[in-house]
Swiss-Prot record:
The EC number(s) this enzyme carries: 3.1.26.11
Name used for this protein in its record: Ribonuclease Z
Binding locations of Zn(2+) 1: 63, 65, 142, 205
Gene, per the UniProt record: rnz
Record keyword Zinc present: yes
SUPFAM superfamilies named in the record: Metallo-hydrolase/oxidoreductase
Keywords, ordered alphabetically: Endonuclease, Hydrolase, Metal-binding, Nuclease, tRNA processing, Zinc
Length: 314
């Protein structure tokens, strides 16, 4: 099975540093790839990370600020050079539609590109299906219209082999039972339990807002910006960003399994300060979220599936 993992291409905020490129986050998911917020220099980072450009199916932009989208032309050119690739869809808020279309035109790449605007609403808006999973977007609170993204796999079923055998359900009958819900007096619930689908959440520039928790609720893996430390909370609020403490608290409240901290201000020479702040916030709420401080070119696996609950005895 193809891996599900996040490739971190860049982690800087508004200004890159000697060791941190502008934004760029590539999610590998069941043989396809979704690229989030490619800032300037993403194409070069893809080479370092050995990312296959033709596998990119969608580019999802949270808002029109340059550090989140100026890498689009280079990525499209890389896809054309490394092809043959699949058609690519470029998603972003309605407010950014013309901006994104211009970036696609500037690329002048021989890649089939569709630009789709997303209504910015205070409720989930379905964007697309990715390998059977639902990709949705929801409004956040930044200085320009901004969305966060959520990729949610449908729940599946875990079958009890012994219960199937006892019920005489074998071979193609298992699939028939799953489709119909009942077969020869045997109910699906008698021989299986629901298995939660995996969830990925992506939240960039935003003030602390209830939508942050909703976007990453029960996420196996979530990327949250933490541009500032809590000691610069006033600056974070004024500029429309999260602090590390706010990111940690949101992840803990949402039940996130692994939190990837990213989008750091260049004012912090030692980013362990931000990681420690987020971990302390998780601990304060009694959360179990693992906090990962992102570095450029990190590869962070989506945690293994949650175990299905035990089937009740009949």
């Amino acid at each position: 099975m193809s891996p599900r993992e996040l490739v971190v291409l860049g982690t800087a905020g508004q200004a890159p540093t000697r060791t941190r490129n502008h934004n760029g986050y590539l999610l590998r998911w069941d043989g396809t790839s979704v690229l989030f917020d490619p800032g300037e220099g993403t194409q070069r980072q893809m080479l370092h990370a050995e990312v296959s450009a033709p596998r990119i199916e969608r580019i999802c932009v949270t808002h029109r600020h340059n550090d989140h989208c100026l890498g689009v032309p280079g990525v499209l050119n890389r896809m054309a050079q490394d092809g043959p690739g699949r058609p690519v869809t470029l998603h972003g808020p309605d407010d950014a539609f013309e901006h994104l279309r211009a970036l696609a035109v500037v690329a002048a790449a021989h890649v089939e590109v569709t630009v789709e605007g997303i209504p910015v609403r205070d409720e989930p808006v379905e964007v697309a299906r990715v390998a059977g999973a639902r990709l949705s977007a929801r409004a956040l609170d930044h200085r320009v219209p901004t969305v966060g993204y959520r990729l949610e796999e449908p729940a599946g079923r875990s079958f009890d082999a012994a219960a199937l055998a006892d019920a005489g359900i074998t071979g193609p009958d298992v699939g028939e039972l799953q489709r119909r819900g009942e077969l020869r007096g045997v109910r699906l619930a008698d021989v299986s339990v629901e298995r939660p689908g995996q969830v990925f959440g992506f939240v960039m520039d935003t003030r602390d807002h209830p939508a942050v928790v909703d976007l990453v609720r029960d996420a196996d893996l979530a990327v949250l910006e933490c541009t500032y430390s809590e000691r610069h909370a006033d600056l974070a609020r004024d500029r429309g960003h999260l602090t590390a403490r706010q990111a940690g608290r949101a992840a803990a409240r949402a039940g996130v399994r692994t939190l990837v901290l990213a989008h750091f201000s260049q004012r912090y020479p030692d980013l362990e300060e931000l990681a420690a702040e987020a971990r302390a916030a998780v601990a304060e709420l009694g959360g179990r979220t693992r906090v990962h401080l992102a570095h450029d070119l990190d590869v962070v696996p989506v945690p293994p599936r949650r175990s299905a609950p035990a089937r009740a005895a009949s």
